[in-house]
């Protein structure tokens, strides 16, 4: 709920025991750029504020592109964008040891790249939030105690 309330330009989805915070690339970056837009740092600061309240989570920041350009260029661009997001989260107080960057390039599209709308959907950064091993262990122990 805190994510939905505080991170207004992202969509939030639950997938099993993790949450996915999805930012459209246009919100964070100019076309074919890795430097964050000024407004993006505000959005990421809001995300960092929530993440600091949940230190027992691990975070994978994933960059994604559409299929425009070469696959090698898109992979590098997506990796650099994921790193840019991590740098801001760390500067806003999120522990670096919790963060991993992954650049998928055009390998994991949400929609077909054959339309402009599909390509827009595919250009994105996702922050996957999952419980760390200690939290998973504590949850398993609590589940055993209550059964």
Q: What spans do the regions from the language model cover?
A:
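Residue-level preference for alpha-helix termini and adjacent loops
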Residues: 26-28, 35, 76, 109
């Amino acid at each position: 709920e805190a994510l939905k309330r505080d991170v207004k330009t992202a969509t939030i989805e639950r997938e099993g025991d993790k949450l996915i915070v999805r930012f459209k690339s246009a919100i964070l970056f100019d076309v074919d750029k890795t430097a964050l837009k000024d407004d993006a740092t505000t959005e990421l600061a809001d995300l960092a504020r929530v993440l600091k309240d949940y230190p027992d989570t691990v975070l994978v920041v994933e960059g994604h592109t559409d299929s425009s350009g070469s696959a090698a260029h898109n992979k590098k661009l997506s990796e650099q964008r994921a790193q840019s997001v991590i740098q801001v989260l760390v500067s806003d107080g999120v522990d670096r040891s919790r963060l991993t960057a992954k650049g998928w390039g055009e390998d994991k599209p949400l929609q077909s790249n054959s339309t402009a709308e599909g390509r827009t959907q595919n250009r994105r950064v996702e922050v996957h939030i999952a419980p760390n091993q200690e939290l998973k262990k504590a949850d398993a122990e609590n589940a055993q105690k209550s059964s």
